[in-house]
């Protein structure tokens, strides 16, 4: 049934966009990338083919653009119904049985849960973050305890920005990404980028390693100065400055070049994490995933609250 509806929609939508001027199609083409990028490009060749057949250029009609945006969103929903990945498992909403509250296992960490606050790239508290706590799978928390113990010997504590992230939060990110007019925090988190490219360039995606429970966002806190260590750019900055392998002095746009001190600080964090089984992410200096994560294909949905864990038999302060 979904396939029949999708085919009918495609035929009629192509007829509509074939009658539109090139400038209008250019924006249609771009919006299609945003809404369909993570769906596997199943409709993308259609938009591309029609776009390439147009040669005239006229001002875009606002009414058509608005209608096209709605059509793109509708198409994205239809494709999602028929493009399920059998390797992905969505856990039951109440299933938090393999998770712990991070501070129960690693009491020395400092918490700054950005998505519980309004200081994040959206500017609002994110759904699913019901309490300002961090959770991880037991395996990831145990490994992070070893990282923390090693870094304390070097004069550092770990500062946590995010751990387990409910799927509803990721869904909210995607909804926000489609609304290209909501740019409240642009000057702080993506000043160099048009919001429309955040999904195509994979700064935001439908699925996140955080939702599997063994990914952590964090930085270093200097115990001597009692300040967060300077890594050269802020957490959740969308841009080249966030790449951990940016070299000292390399031009990176709006941010001042990374200094040798910034680079060295990033490497202190990266080495400590890798020494205890975490792998870095090449686009974010703060992001690490347990290499041998226990749920590589399972995405969890329970909210971030102690009640999620207290409902599990035998849970008490992180010990089963």
Model-inferred region functions:
Residues 3, 8-9, 13, 24-25, ...:
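Short hydrophobic targeting helices and cationic amphipathic motifs
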Residues 4-7, 12, 22, 72, ...:
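N-terminal hydrophobic alpha-helix used for membrane targeting or insertion
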Residues 37-90:
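Bacterial Sec-dependent N-terminal signal peptides
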Residues 288:
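Conserved metal-phosphate-binding beta-hairpin within the catalytic cores
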Residues 292:
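Short, Lys/Arg-enriched alpha-helical microdomains
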């Amino acid at each position: 049934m979904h396939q029949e509806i999708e085919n009918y929609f495609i035929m009629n939508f192509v007829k509509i966009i074939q009658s539109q001027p090139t400038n209008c199609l250019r924006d249609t083409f771009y919006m299609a990338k945003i809404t369909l990028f993570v769906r596997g490009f199943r409709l993308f060749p259609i938009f591309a083919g029609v776009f390439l057949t147009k040669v005239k250029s006229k001002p875009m009609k606002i009414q058509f653009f608005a209608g096209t945006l709605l059509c793109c969103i509708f198409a994205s929903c239809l494709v999602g119904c028929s493009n399920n990945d059998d390797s992905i498992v969505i856990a039951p909403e109440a299933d938090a049985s393999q998770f712990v509250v991070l501070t129960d296992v690693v009491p020395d960490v400092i918490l700054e849960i950005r998505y519980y606050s309004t200081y994040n790239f959206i500017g609002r508290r994110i759904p699913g973050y019901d309490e300002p706590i961090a959770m991880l799978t037991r395996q990831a928390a145990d490994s992070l305890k070893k990282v923390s113990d090693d870094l304390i010997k070097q004069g550092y504590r770990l500062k946590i920005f995010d751990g387990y992230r409910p799927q509803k939060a990721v869904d909210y990110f995607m909804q926000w990404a489609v609304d290209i007019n909501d740019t409240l925090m642009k000057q702080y988190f993506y000043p160099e980028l048009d919001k429309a490219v955040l999904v195509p360039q994979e700064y935001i995606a439908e699925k996140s390693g955080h939702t599997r429970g063994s990914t952590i966002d964090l930085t270093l806190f200097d115990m001597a100065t009692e300040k967060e260590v300077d890594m050269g750019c802020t957490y959740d900055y969308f841009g080249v400055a966030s790449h951990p392998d940016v070299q000292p002095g390399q031009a990176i746009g709006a941010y001042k070049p990374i200094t040798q001190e910034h680079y060295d600080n990033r490497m202190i964090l990266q080495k400590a994490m890798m020494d205890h089984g975490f792998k870095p992410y090449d686009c974010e200096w703060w992001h690490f995933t347990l290499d041998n994560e226990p749920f590589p294909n399972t995405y969890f949905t329970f909210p971030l609250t102690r009640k999620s864990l207290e409902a599990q038999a035998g849970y008490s302060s992180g010990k089963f």
